[in-house]
A protein has these predicted regions:
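Chymotrypsin/trypsin-fold serine protease catalytic domain
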Residues: 219-311
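Conserved catalytic-core segment of clan PA serine endopeptidases
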Residues: 111-133, 139-148, 154, 175-238
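Terminal peptide-recognition signature
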Residues: 138, 151, 157, 161, ...
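C-terminal cap/linker of serine protease catalytic domains
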Residues: 344-389
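Protease-domain processing segments flanking chymotrypsin-fold serine proteases, especially trypsin-like
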Residues: 24-150, 379-389
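Catalytic nucleophile loop of clan PA
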Residues: 312-350
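Bacterial N-terminal signal peptides that target proteins for export
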Residues: 1-11
Length: 389
């Protein structure tokens, strides 16, 4: 049995990752979250979620057998109205100096080039601008401790993140008290800020194949969604879901946007967003660009898992952050035309795991399929359609 090391608490647990197709009913939802009071989360001292693989890098392989899924699909995003709330969350103690230039392309021992840099540069708070503002930090409780991941909106009231930021399959139970803060920002001058407000969750959804403690499926199903509550603006009287203010990304599944679907060797250009604590203490949004490749991970004993691999310097705290195709806004075209899969700002995976060693500078993610992301989004939207219409 292959093992992953869960470094968020220093504990280890065995995980077997197997490739299978989930049925339409194979989803698990949390109890409704009834705590609407503020003050229960420790924003300044939250512990980053961080899943690290301890199997050999040689386990990453490329196989020739084609992978069969349904047709590629996509659900488009929207811009939102941009209304700010400017909530203050408390003080911080360590000075963060501004970085004014993007870093050059680099790579680790995995030989996957990447460029990781702050989103905010040249004194400009670009993290508050569309489409960056759709991404944010996700705080939640594991017992009495506050943990943190990254996340983003993919419907006006639906937030996507990694399943391991929602469900503890070592204890076979959901975490609690999730709170999403889009465009989170902090430094020693302004403290901890929520420019578009903070949003509590109503309920969480994960694939049952991930939650099943017997199978311990992770890589093929490490994606989940949160159904959010509205947040009132005391200045304007409006009451909105996060995606109504910040906008929301689209999402694609079953190989949407890749050069050869979900077959091994298929590639795409990923723009990754998140809040790794290894960069600016996790106070500022980081962006990473890298070519993604679909591979098969050989876990031994006949078990394999799908993975999308990129080069990245991001670490713990980036879990659940979006991996996007076609990031930004296409210009007015003249004398040329858009290529295949031209939709902008489409999430096709979320940050899932990295290696135990820092040397590879590589991260892996579950590719979105109709057996994971579409399954949980459809379940959440069927249960609470007002978050999705």
């Amino acid at each position: 049995m292959s093992k992953l090391s869960n470094v968020m608490t220093g504990l280890s647990f065995g995980l077997v990752l197997i490739l299978s197709q989930a049925g339409a009913s194979d989803v698990l939802s949390s109890p409704e979250q009834t705590n609407n009071a503020s003050g229960g989360l420790d924003y300044a001292n939250a512990i980053p979620m961080d899943i690290r693989a301890t199997f050999s890098e040689a386990a990453v392989q490329r196989v020739t057998e084609p992978v069969s899924f349904g047709e590629p699909g996509v659900s488009p995003g929207a811009k939102g109205n941009g209304e700010k709330l400017h909530e203050y969350l408390g003080e911080v103690g360590t000075v963060v100096s501004m970085q004014n230039v993007a870093v050059p392309s680099e790579h680790g021992t995995a030989n996957r080039p990447y460029a990781t840099t702050r989103v905010d540069m040249f004194g400009q708070r670009l993290s508050r601008k569309f489409p960056n503002r759709i991404t944010g930090k996700l705080f939640f409780k594991k017992g009495t401790d506050t943990y943190v991941c990254s996340a983003s909106s993919i419907k006006k009231g639906i937030v996507v993140t990694a399943a391991h930021c929602i469900y503890d399959n070592s204890a076979d139970k959901f975490y609690t008290e999730w709170e999403f803060i889009p465009a989170f920002y902090a430094d020693s001058k302004v403290g901890l800020k929520a420019p578009y407000g903070k949003y509590k969750s109503l309920k969480a959804w994960v694939p049952s194949a991930y939650a099943n403690p017997t199978d311990n499926v992770v890589n093929d199903y490490d994606v989940g969604v949160l159904v959010m509550k509205k947040r009132p603006n005391p200045d304007t009287g409006t009451n909105m879901y996060p995606g109504e203010r910040t906008g929301f990304y689209g999402y694609g599944w079953n190989g949407w946007g890749y050069t050869n679907g979900l077959n091994d060797g298929s590639i795409g250009l990923i723009h990754q967003l998140g809040y790794p604590v290894s960069h600016d203490h996790g106070w500022q949004m980081q962006a990473n660009d890298s070519q993604a490749e679909k591979v098969t991970v050989n876990l031994g004993s006949g078990n394999t898992a799908m993975a999308i691999m990129i080069g990245s310097r991001e670490t713990g705290g980036s879990s659940g952050g979006p991996w996007l195709f076609n990031y930004g806004q296409i210009g007015a075209l003249s004398g040329t035309s858009a290529g295949t899969y031209p939709n902008n700002d489409i999430v096709v995976a979320v940050t899932s795991w990295g290696w135990g060693s820092d040397d590879p500078k590589e991260q892996g993610a579950t590719p979105f399929t109709d057996a994971n992301v579409k399954l949980v989004v459809d379940g959440a939207c069927s249960d609470t359609p007002d978050r999705c219409d």
